[in-house]
Design a protein with these regions (language model features):
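Juxtamembrane helix-loop junctions of ABC transporter transmembrane domains
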Residues: 9-16, 48-64, 68, 89-136, ...
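An intracellular "coupling" helix at the cytosolic face of ABC transporter transmembrane type-1 domains
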Residues: 25-32, 128-129, 147-154, 158, ...
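Transmembrane helices of ABC transporter permease
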Residues: 30, 34-44, 159-210, 283-303
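Internal alpha-helical transmembrane segments of multi-pass membrane proteins, especially GPCRs
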Residues: 36-40, 52, 80, 84, ...
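Helix-loop-helix
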Residues: 65-67, 174-188, 262-340, 346, ...
Length: 381
């Protein structure tokens, strides 16, 4: 048992970048058409999600002009056109969401099925020494814990990160289009949120990786003890068995507690930072309007309420996307850890087949084993 555990603990770990690259490359090989279609639909959905701020500014500008001129008849048509166009974009976003979610569901489950088949086929060709140095429970965890972690990463985390990245890039472009000064204010607050995510999320991620490995060790230990339970009872080895299990079980408790401690602390902190950033943006916008601060923007529009209100909406969007990223980091880390173990198993060298073995009758003459032409009850090959 100790030998197997020690062997598992010293296996080399692949770099995270190579693991993700290899995972995506294999997904592309499995689904060369459906995967890019699903990813493209995710990008379209993200762009549609970023557009409401643009239409909000347009509608507020139209209403503001109506208040000044009193000509509602001309403003009514423009408002209806913008609302209808926004509704069209929402419908496109809904259709893109359907294509994205359904496509990624097919890709995820199909890819996992192919990985399980590849692992099982590869396992049949592994040498006996591999099974002598790896616990049965540890091998089983490839098909359960590790595959499930990959499912979470491929089916939810990676599409969510792509969606969030596109939304953030789109919102940043829109912010600088309307006001560079306000964009810098929001980016400063976002950088503080990113710093908190890096510090707390990094500590949480390390413990989630340890949790993934320790869970496999616990399963391997339990599987080994269950298979040898009769031997344990015959030799009255129950106290030592309980002691060894308590040790590894306590280790799993510690790493799981630390992982969830940091993860559960991060989200409330980010939510409150997002609320503070929202208030700061509202105050700064009011000051800019009151002092008639000259706006610096690509659009050339003055800084008015029509510009300020969409920035409040974009502040919410920005903080929400950062929260979503922080929530997916742990799933990605656990998925990478699971993929690393799966790829290590697939990369194990197979047993060399040097032909068939023929059994013959043998006898020992002068200390040398020789082939006998009659039945001796002893065999050699």
């Amino acid at each position: 048992m100790s030998k197997a555990t020690e062997t598992n603990g010293t296996r080399p770990k692949l770099p995270v970048g190579k693991i993700l690259t290899r995972t995506i490359k294999m997904l592309w090989e499995f689904y060369p058409v459906l995967l890019p279609v699903a990813l493209l639909a995710t990008v379209v959905q993200a762009i549609m999600q970023s557009l409401p701020s643009v239409f909000l500014e347009r509608i507020l500008s139209i209403i503001s002009n109506y208040i000044d001129s009193g000509d509602w008849s001309s403003a009514e048509g423009l408002v209806f056109q913008n609302v209808a166009l926004l509704a069209t974009f929402y419908v496109l976003g809904l259709l893109a969401n359907i294509v994205s979610t359904q496509g990624m569901a097919i890709v995820t489950q199909g890819a996992l099925q192919k990985w399980r088949s590849k692992m099982f086929s590869h396992m049949q060709d592994l040498p006996i020494r591999y099974f002598d140095t790896h616990l049965n429970g540890d091998i089983m965890s490839y098909y359960t814990n590790d595959i499930d972690a990959m499912r979470q990463m491929i089916g939810m985390s990676l599409p969510q990160l792509l969606f969030t990245s596109v939304v953030i890039i789109s919102v940043i472009f829109i912010m600088f289009y309307y006001s560079a000064l306000m964009a810098l204010v929001i980016l400063f607050g976002a950088s503080l949120m990113a710093l908190a995510t890096k510090n707390l999320g990094g500590k949480s991620a390390k413990n989630f990786v340890k949790t993934q490995k320790t869970t496999a060790d616990v399963e391997g230990h339990i599987q080994e003890i269950m298979n040898g339970e009769k031997v344990v009872k015959v030799f009255s080895h129950e106290p030592e068995t309980i002691e060894s299990f308590d040790k590894i079980n306590d280790e799993l408790m510690v790493v799981s507690r630390n992982a969830n401690l940091y993860a559960n602390t991060l989200m409330p902190i980010l939510n409150n930072m997002g609320n503070i950033m929202y208030v700061i943006v509202a105050i700064v916008s009011g000051v800019f309007i009151a002092l008639n601060v000259q706006n610096i923007s690509i659009s050339g529009l003055p800084f008015t309420i029509a510009v300020a209100v969409p920035f409040l909406n974009m502040t919410r969007q920005f903080s929400t996307q950062i929260n979503l990223i922080s929530g997916q980091i742990n799933s990605v880390v656990m998925g990478v850890a699971g993929a690393n173990r799966v790829f290590e198993m697939l990369d194990e060298p197979t047993e060399t087949d040097e032909g068939y073995v023929t059994l013959v009758c043998s006898e020992t003459i002068d200390g040398q084993v020789q082939e006998a032409e009659y039945r001796t009850g002893y065999w050699a090959w």
